[in-house]
Amino acid sequence: PLWAQVNALLPEGALDGFSRFTVFTDGLDETLAYVSPLDDTGTRWELAVDPADAGELDWFTETVLHEYTHYLTLNDTQADYGAPESGARYCEEGMVARSGSYLDDFYHAFWTDYLHDRLANPDSYGFYLRHQADFVTDYASTDPSEDIAESFTYFVLWDAPEGDAVWEEKLNFFYRYPELVEFRTQARARLGL
């Protein structure tokens, strides 16, 4: 039933990059789901879901979309694993976002002005409080990867924002990509939105 629940949320073919579905538990109210690459190139992925935390439908939906966004933005078409760090592109340990990727474009659009502030004070919640109006959730302020995952989740789940707050600009960012708009349309149809 968990696989069916996940499959029911996402557009047809969205899970083609996944080779493994894992059911695990770390107890109630802990990690609901995660994704992880299965190889050193980000080509094949694992999706893991905890049935102990999967009962609340809204939280389950938000979490699956969030975790799927990590796959969407960090798979081998979007990121280069093992490439040398580049000052021109967004980097995480062991990964460089490809030029023109969703994550690199998002980083350049929204994070270059934050970087020194974020690195100077690793207290995520303090950083969030200084920039609260710029993030859709406090967790989004963790780093660009979490920000894009949270932003894409609510791009899918919410109606298009009409304001000009930075968090709204982040949700509207995804309208630049016809394939992401199509993903949104199909996912919303599956969710009855």
Regions picked out by a protein language model, each given a short descriptive name:
Residues 129-193:
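Pan-zinc metallopeptidase signature
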Residues 84-138:
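Acidic/His/Gly-enriched intrinsically disordered linker/tail segments
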Residues 2, 6, 60, 64, ...:
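Stable alpha-helical elements in mature extracytoplasmic
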Residues 67-87:
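Catalytic Zn2+-binding segment of zinc metalloproteases
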Residues 48-65:
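Short pre-active-site segment immediately N-terminal to the catalytic Zn-binding motif
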Residues 1-42, 53:
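Auxiliary, metal-adjacent structural segments of Zn-dependent hydrolase domains
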Residues 22, 46-49, 71-73, 147-153:
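Structural recognition of the beta-strand scaffold that forms the well-ordered cores
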